């Protein structure tokens, strides 16, 4: 069977409905269908050095989502580090990563497999966080996705979420299934379990079928993105800072928008049932 036809059939099977009545239940249903397809976690099956380019892995278990806005590589980092498009001209990075002298090259691969090379001309830090914003030398190609963030009222759609305090600090407890990348561009599963002072904490997934797709973070994974699924869309939550922890991008939304000079794109949760 033609590969494109097969992918179309699988995509229809996975994303038959854009949303379900319950957001978290819909995520788990989609994960189950995706995991039935494959256990291969690699976004790319191979790469070439001259000319530099990556081949998308058609057997990746999460290949039905759009990963084209995640950097395939950064020149001068030896394979570590990562970045994600938050506008046509800006990339979310981790501030503590020792990026090369500016300008340096960053690479993206669209869904058909074409590699695009851009230069990061400057990096702005969000004060008091590990968030950095890289500016590209030109607008990213329209075939590369710019990721959205959650709306401000996202918590109203999460069953069982609680808000408390510990030593005067607000602590949000929840179970939110997420997908994330590591330095080898492999797709893993996990659960956000706490939000404390603008930092999200990730643990192995409680959802049993997803546990086989979990991999603990390591040094070198910093800057690679963490997403939550909203229907057929990956929505950006942040980028790795340290093992199991990353800055919650919504906490610093205003500061990020001031740097990029525009509003971040916001995902639509209105089709889901509010539970709070």
Residue ranges and their predicted role:
Residues 87, 102, 128-132, 172-175, ...:
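Residues that flank catalytic or metal-binding motifs in active/ligand-binding sites
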Residues 162-209, 217-218:
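Flexible, gly/ser-rich surface segments that form the specificity/activation loops bordering the active-site cleft
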Residues 31, 99-163, 183-192:
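Conserved catalytic-core segment of clan PA serine endopeptidases
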Residues 59-94, 127, 223:
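A conserved glycine-rich beta-strand in the N-terminal activation segment of trypsin-fold
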Residues 1-15:
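Single-pass alpha-helical membrane anchors
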Residues 51, 85, 91, 132-136, ...:
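A structural motif
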């Amino acid at each position: 069977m033609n590969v494109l036809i097969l992918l179309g059939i699988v995509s229809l099977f996975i994303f038959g409905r854009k949303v379900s009545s319950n957001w978290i239940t819909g995520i788990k249903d989609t994960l189950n269908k995706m995991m039935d397809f494959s256990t291969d976690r690699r976004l790319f099956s191979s790469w070439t050095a001259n000319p530099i380019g990556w081949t998308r892995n058609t057997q990746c278990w999460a290949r039905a989502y759009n990963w084209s806005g995640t950097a395939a590589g950064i020149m001068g980092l030896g394979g570590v580090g990562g970045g994600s498009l938050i506008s046509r001209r800006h990339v979310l990075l981790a501030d503590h990563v020792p990026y090369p002298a500016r300008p340096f090259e960053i690479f993206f691969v669209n869904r058909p497999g074409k590699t695009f090379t851009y230069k990061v001309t400057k990096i702005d830090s969000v004060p008091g966080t590990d968030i950095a914003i890289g500016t590209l030398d030109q607008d990213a190609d329209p075939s590369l996705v710019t990721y959205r963030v959650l709306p401000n009222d996202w918590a109203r759609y999460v069953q069982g979420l609680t808000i408390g305090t510990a030593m005067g600090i607000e602590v949000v407890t929840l179970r939110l299934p997420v997908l994330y990348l590591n330095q080898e561009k492999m797709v893993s599963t996990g659960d956000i379990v706490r939000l404390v002072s603008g930092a999200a904490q990730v643990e192995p997934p409680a959802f049993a079928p997803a546990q086989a797709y979990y991999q603990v973070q390591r040094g070198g994974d910093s800057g690679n993105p963490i997403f939550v699924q909203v229907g057929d869309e990956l929505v950006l939550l942040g980028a790795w800072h340290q093992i199991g922890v990353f800055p919650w991008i919504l906490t610093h939304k205003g500061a990020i928008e001031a740097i990029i000079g525009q509003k971040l794109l916001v995902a639509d949760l209105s089709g889901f049932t509010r539970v709070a």
